[in-house]
Amino acid sequence: FADELVFRYTGEPGIARTKIAYVSELGTARELFVMDYDGYDPRQLTADGFLNLMPRWSPDRRFLVFTTYRNRNTQDIDMIELATGKRWTLVAQGGLNITPVFSPDGNSLAYSSSHEGNAELYRLDTKTKAVQRLTTHAAGDLSPSWSPSGRELVFTSDRSGGPQIFLMSADGSNVRRLTFEGDYNAAPAWSPRGNW
């Protein structure tokens, strides 16, 4: 009811029914949890003794994608359905597979992978499981973030020496550098509406 009132008077969605995904250290493992926005009702999602990191919500809030470190040599990207607890692997290419993030429509997943040697950005079609390589550069490309429209990705790359922020079309074309101040600019995150 509170969320409906907030929306009616502000046009913005309320937070009363929102959840927060987080990582908790349990012994040597890092497990995924969700809790209510006020800290109540924590629920453990993983209990496998692995390092499970970097959870990201699907746009419909039914799924979380995350990086799981099953052994020292590979990091896979898994997805878990919150209602059922069903978990499956989306990316298991060998090497480092990190920083997964859903497109705004939920039809694609952008991530960074080093399975061919160097960290590059890839796009996974969540329905067909087809994978498209987005970047091909001698430098490392990491931390993709979708524009609200889903037409562009911003990411971190050290292709200009130190880490800087770059922008490209969602198909990997039209790559251009955005930051020129400072020696270390990383971990870009697009505002939900794109206006900040």
Kindly give the residue locations of the regions a language model identified.
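A flexible loop/linker signature enriched in serine peptidases of the S9 family
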Residues: 13, 24-31, 47-50, 67-77, ...
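C-terminal/domain-edge helix-coil "capping" segments
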Residues: 1-44
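Hydrophobic beta-strand positions that form the internal "hydrophobic ladder"
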Residues: 20, 61-64, 106-110, 150-154, ...
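Leucine-rich, hydrophobic repeat-scaffold detector
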Residues: 3, 43-81
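A structural motif specific to WD40 beta-propellers
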Residues: 43, 88, 132, 175-176
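Short loop/turn segments that connect beta-strands within beta-propeller blades
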Residues: 36-40, 81-85, 125-129, 169-173
